[in-house]
Amino acid sequence: WLDRTVLIICDPTTDDGVPIAVAPRSILRNQINRIEALNLRAMVASELEYFLYRTSYREAAQTAYRELEPAGWYIEDYHLLQGARTEDLNGAFRRYLSEMAVPVESTKGEFGRGQHELNIRWSEALEMADRHVLLKQCVKEVADQNGAAATFMAKPHDSEAGSSSHLHLSLWSTDEPNNLFPGATEILGLKVSDTFRHFLGGW
């Protein structure tokens, strides 16, 4: 979203090149290594919800972040019209993320005024974590470029629906590209494997 600009995600290290243990990517990589030792791969998809405002970040700061103007004026969950009314922003998010090789599946209105959701296609856990960071950076900066504002806060308004971040998790075999969760055991109408049962509840 900025011409002639590169955004680099990297791992912090000591002067000797040792990864910083408490860095989020180091922590996640350690967990991935533990999973891979079991011949498994963790696959993740992300759904992030956020509120959009026609108030700029500067204007919001000047009013102590009160009385912000929602990008939508009614609850738009699955409503056809409101999607077009915020396409200037959501469309830009999708385009810029796609240009950065972050595959967006969809955007949609949610159950709060100006609330939306952006879904990213699943990938391996570390790549998804990086995509998650890029998504939030993109949404905030592109909103700012358009005189708008966005927040991923869980509950910015007590009178509106809250925002969440849904993560879809599955375990795959390292030997072949198979999701190990489907199986023969029925739970609540789903046919699942023992791997899924252990993953879900430890039983």
Tell where the protein language model's regions lie, with residue ranges.
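Glycine-rich, acidic/polar active-site loops that bind/position phosphate-bearing ligands
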Residues: 1-203
